[in-house]
Amino acid sequence: MTLWFVFALMTVAAIFAVLWPLGRSARAQNQGSEVVVYKDQLTEIERDLASGLIAAPEAEAARVEISRRLLAAAGSEPVSEPKSSLKWRRAAAVLALVGLPLVAIGVYMPLGSPRLQDFPLAQRERGSGSGMAGSLENLVVQVEQHLEKNPTDGRGWNVLAPVLERLGRFDDAVRAYRNSITYNGESPERRSDLGEAISAAAGGVVTAEAKTEFERAHALNADDPKANYFLGLAAEQDGRKDDAATIWRALLAKAPADAPWRPLVQSSLVRVGGGTMPALSDETIAASKDMSEGDRGAMVRGMVERLATRLKQNSDDVEGWLRLVRAYLVMGDRDKAVGASSDARQAVAKDTERLRQLNEGLKTLGLDG
């Protein structure tokens, strides 16, 4: 109710501001005209002459000039409008002041919906999101229409392919990646992207066709992360978990510390059991063959202790924590394994993604509590 009252006051104020000049007489507006100015100047000349500030000839010349201007200005002044015209204008102003709001209300009531509730913000945001998705699909249609007319536009295929893959149109994405390679030339990234799209179309399985593309990407760039990851995944799916672990370990060894795909590779390595114990050098393995069982156990415990010490300095190493927990379990020391898992969770508690990977790894080790 208060809001409608404020709107009404604002409407009245706006109408009043527009119509106020219609109710004023022309005489009031003429008070500041040139005639009044010249009359004041004549009076001032008489005052200066009487006080002796100017001589009589100068006063006479000024009086003649100002009188001439006064007559000219008086002849150009508009004639005051009759009172009847002023009354009509005032009546029109009052009629507009009262009539316009009534007309607005009369039009709004049958057409408007004053009781309609506000459109909730959540629904507006959902509507906006669906609108954006629809807009993206419209853009895809436009690009596809352009490529139908210009099929050799390599840049168009290069732009379209990842968008199609993101929309879940994997078969179309495969075709777009192939055309991108045809018209842009091959590169490690394009071969890897094509292999990924083929795998996605197969439900995540690295098929022989997809593996061929990853091998081509690897031949162009042996350090291509996507090619190496999927080649490791192909080895895992073929049952060659040791080969998968070897590929992924090599990938992590060369990976930057802030690589966005590093957590994915680490969790995959844990999945295939690649983080059981710290890696042994060839010399250590050869020396261990001549050790007694007790000496060999002491060597393993020393390696585990060094790993635990290293994790105190580099506490965000999820793969290292999982190796340590698994090592304790292999040694039959479940209490230390539980303690290490607790320390690990505390170390990565502020990193949501690392904590998720850690919990998944611990769950595979039977320590999901």
Swiss-Prot record:
Keywords per UniProt: Cell inner membrane, Cell membrane, Cytochrome c-type biogenesis, Membrane, Transmembrane, Transmembrane helix
Keyword DNA damage set for record: no
Bilayer topology term: Multi-pass membrane protein
Location, primary (coarse class): membrane
Domain of life of the organism encoding this protein: Bacteria
Any GO BP annotation: cytochrome complex assembly
Segments on the Periplasmic side according to the record's topology features: 112-369
Cellular localization per UniProt: Cell inner membrane
One Gene Ontology CC term in the entry: plasma membrane
Membrane-spanning intervals of the chain: 7-23, 91-111
NCBIfam families per record: cytochro_ccmI
Described purpose of this protein according to its UniProt entry: Required for the biogenesis of c-type cytochromes. Possible subunit of a heme lyase.
Protein name: Cytochrome c-type biogenesis protein CycH
